């Protein structure tokens, strides 16, 4: 193996490993809201994640459901009262006019390809 090939292989391994260094912090940890209210959940990354962010909703006993990907794009079938925004290290999920079916847990996820 040539020196150039070895260097490229090491660089590729370093770049792949670097992706795992991002830490995500979501707030608030818990939230109390009523039907009709507007709710905003924020997610902060420890480094620029270039809009590679997804939001999920999970109801008790069910699998998480994708709401938003690429920070701002609504997944198919997601009501327009949901919206994602942000860039760089700061992101948010906003739910306008909260509906009974919106109650559950919400999670942000940093990803490196479309979920």
Curated annotation (Swiss-Prot):
Residue span of region Framework-2: 55-69
The UniProt entry's GO CC annotations, sorted and at most eight, read:
immunoglobulin complex
Gene3D superfamilies noted in UniProt: Immunoglobulins
Q: List the disulfide bonds.
A: 43-108
Q: Where is this region: Complementarity-determining-1?
A: 44-54
SMART domains per the UniProt record, alphabetical: IG, IGv
What's a Pfam family in this record? V-set
The region called Complementarity-determining-2 is annotated at 70-76
One Gene Ontology term of the biological-process aspect is: adaptive immune response
At the top level, the lineage of the source is Eukaryota
Secretion signal, residue range per the UniProt entry: 1-20
Q: Which PROSITE patterns match?
A: IG_LIKE
List keywords of the entry alphabetically: Adaptive immunity, Disulfide bond, Immunity, Immunoglobulin, Signal
List the residue ranges of the region (Complementarity-determining-3): 109-115
Q: Where is this region: Framework-3?
A: 77-108
Q: Where do the record's region annotations for Framework-1 lie?
A: 21-43
Give the misc comment: The gene was isolated and sequenced separately from two different sources, embryos and cultured plasmacytoma cells that secrete the similar kappa chain MOPC 149.
Protein name per the record: Immunoglobulin kappa chain variable 12-41
Gene from which the chain derives: Igkv12-41
């Amino acid at each position: 193996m040539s020196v150039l090939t070895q260097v490229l292989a090491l660089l590729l391994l370093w770049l792949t490993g670097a992706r795992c260094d991002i830490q995500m912090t979501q707030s608030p940890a818990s939230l109390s809201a009523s039907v009709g209210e507007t709710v905003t959940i924020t997610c902060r990354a420890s480094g620029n994640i270039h809009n590679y962010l997804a939001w999920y909703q999970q109801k008790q006993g069910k699998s998480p459901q994708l709401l938003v990907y690429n920070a701002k794009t609504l997944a198919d079938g997601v009501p327009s009262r949901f919206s994602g925004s942000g860039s760089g290290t700061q992101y948010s999920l906003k739910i306008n006019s909260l509906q009974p079916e919106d109650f559950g847990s919400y999670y942000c996820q940093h990803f490196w390809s479309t979920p």
